[in-house]
């Protein structure tokens, strides 16, 4: 199978403008992401709408492509990038540009989901463990899966609701699963899902993947035990710097 990885990265961000170019351990955040992904997927590109990001990627030897500024999601930006890059691809991998600690094994896990020819879309889930505070956090979407590892639903709410137990006991009664926002799609499926109108579930939860479920697409969920640290705010960057120092 032929894989290509696209890292969508835009400069404009409400909470942290320019975060792909923020410096972490002496390198731009986007460079950390690119180096991790390209060590697994030879054909790796950054798709951006900003010259500063484009020039930075080319300066460190990466591949970048300019896209429109009006995309509503990273998935839409990836579809435009693939059309411009050209070539024949079996699977397209979507890695967020603000995930400098994405692990190579996580990318490999998502890729292996496509060993099953019936897989249309794949993503990752990580057990929450007994951290009820994290489970209750609406900024950490939860997944429930079926016996074959396909997503039944994603939600910012705690799913499932554990009846007859105090909230503090929920994590001891059910293995809650956190969604890790790494995606991969069959090439034809990516083209199809970017043409779907926004659905009511997506609007309610503000989770793009619900559009795909609502339209009958199946999402395979690979599992990982590795936590990732996304950079959404300047405070997240400070925490990431402290994390890196702890590794030295």
Each language-model region and where it sits:
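Short, high-confidence coil segments that cap the C-terminus of an alpha-helix
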Residues: 41, 87-89, 116-120, 217
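Conserved alpha/beta core of the MobA/IspD/sugar-nucleotide pyrophosphorylase nucleotidyltransferase superfamily
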Residues: 87, 170-248
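N-terminal glycine-rich phosphate-binding loop and ensuing alpha1 helix
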Residues: 2-48
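Residue-level detector of anion-binding/catalytic polar loops
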Residues: 43, 63, 217-220
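Short phosphate-binding loop-to-helix
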Residues: 45, 51-109
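Conserved core of the sugar-phosphate nucleotidyltransferase
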Residues: 104-195
